[in-house]
Amino acid sequence: DLKGARILLVEDNDFNIMVAQDELQASIPDVQVDVAKNGIEAVARVKAKTYDLVLMDVQMPEMNGYDATRAIRALGGTYEQLPIIAMTANVMKAEVQRCIDAGMTGFIPKPFERNELLATLHSVLSGRQGE
């Protein structure tokens, strides 16, 4: 059950932010979506608040998604288990592997389909404890 999920959306493109927020809010009851526009903001937000999942764009200014994921994983403890899902238009096998090597948990190609997004979120969050 994804109800009430706390999701950090890390994306620098305003249109993509709007689309992702709309999809998440239309699909998940009581979802909480916070936005970070680059990797530096993402790491700061993850340190400041508990999230169930991070949706991470990989190509961003200041700090990309790979480096942000590595920085989050380096925090240790529960941060090593935090689901981080890559969002990228590049679906080449090498790109998917690069995301996994950086410590990401899953992968969603952009532009994403609502069903694909929800299936990925369900599979990643199926073990989360309800508050």
Regions found by a protein language model. Give the residues of each.
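C-terminal compact regulatory domains
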Residues: 1-131
